[in-house]
Amino acid sequence: MTNADPHELQKFSDLAHRWWDPNAEFKPLHELNPIRLKWIDAHAHLAGKTVLDIGCGGGILSESMAGLGAHVKGIDLSTQALGVADLHSLESGVTVDYEEIAAEALAAREPAKYDVVTCMEMLEHVPQPAAIVEACKTLVKPGGWVFFSTLNRNVKSYLFAVIGAEYIARMLPKGTHDYARFIRPSELASFVRAADLRTADIKGIVYNPLSKHFMLSADTSVNYMLACRRDV
């Protein structure tokens, strides 16, 4: 059975044509992208590296990493999102290899192939996030980097990421997130340990409503990113 929720897939497939509109439903991803890209590159030095972007959607992060000189493969289970990603890659002239395949299936086919694996804003949308973390460990080379980003599960994250972002500020479509699937840092850390990955860094991302910009922070109470390594 594929580790995917059909409702979640349909939700993002229905919005696929909006991926590259910086003022539409995926505006927060466009605003987040420079911050997460800079953070990933600071750790992994992307130029010349083989990179896998799991849950790549329309390719916002995939193209950005390729633009820094990485050899990027993006995978997703949304046919529509991948179609948009392929088309935008042709238009932009940035080469990314896209494929519709589950992370677990690719892990069985291409173990220890990638220098860097990214899985951003994806874990909170799947039924078994621990299985994705395990697949990431299998896919990355010994000594390589794995990066995750997701949402913490607490009252503040519910108020900010669901009520605030979806219903008040309307930064995201209603129903984008299922609070029950948010993942506490301690839970993600346990998935990482179980997969024999080593946590190297954790950073929060906060939104300033006055400047309307995201920034890195020590505050992991809502959005956060985790950098891990597979030991040699």
UniProtKB/Swiss-Prot annotation:
Pathway: Cofactor biosynthesis; ubiquinone biosynthesis. S-adenosyl-L-methionine binds at residues 36, 55, 76, 120. The keyword S-adenosyl-L-methionine applies. Pfam families: Methyltransf_23. Keywords: Methyltransferase, S-adenosyl-L-methionine, Transferase, Ubiquinone biosynthesis. The keyword RNA-binding does not apply. GO terms for biological process: methylation. SUPFAM superfamilies: S-adenosyl-L-methionine-dependent methyltransferases. Its EC number is 2.1.1.222, 2.1.1.64. Signal peptide: none annotated. GO terms for molecular function: 2-polyprenyl-6-hydroxyphenol methylase activity; 3-demethylubiquinol 3-O-methyltransferase activity; polyprenyldihydroxybenzoate methyltransferase activity. It catalyses: a 3-demethylubiquinol + S-adenosyl-L-methionine = a ubiquinol + S-adenosyl-L-homocysteine + H(+); a 3-(all-trans-polyprenyl)benzene-1,2-diol + S-adenosyl-L-methionine = a 2-methoxy-6-(all-trans-polyprenyl)phenol + S-adenosyl-L-homocysteine + H(+). It comes from the Bacteria. PANTHER family: METHYLTRANSFERASE (PTHR43464), UBIQUINONE BIOSYNTHESIS O-METHYLTRANSFERASE, MITOCHONDRIAL (PTHR43464:SF19). O-methyltransferase that catalyzes the 2 O-methylation steps in the ubiquinone biosynthetic pathway. HAMAP family: UbiG (MF_00472). Belongs to the methyltransferase superfamily. UbiG/COQ3 family. This is Ubiquinone biosynthesis O-methyltransferase. It comes from Paraburkholderia phytofirmans (strain DSM 17436 / LMG 22146 / PsJN) (Burkholderia phytofirmans). The gene is ubiG.
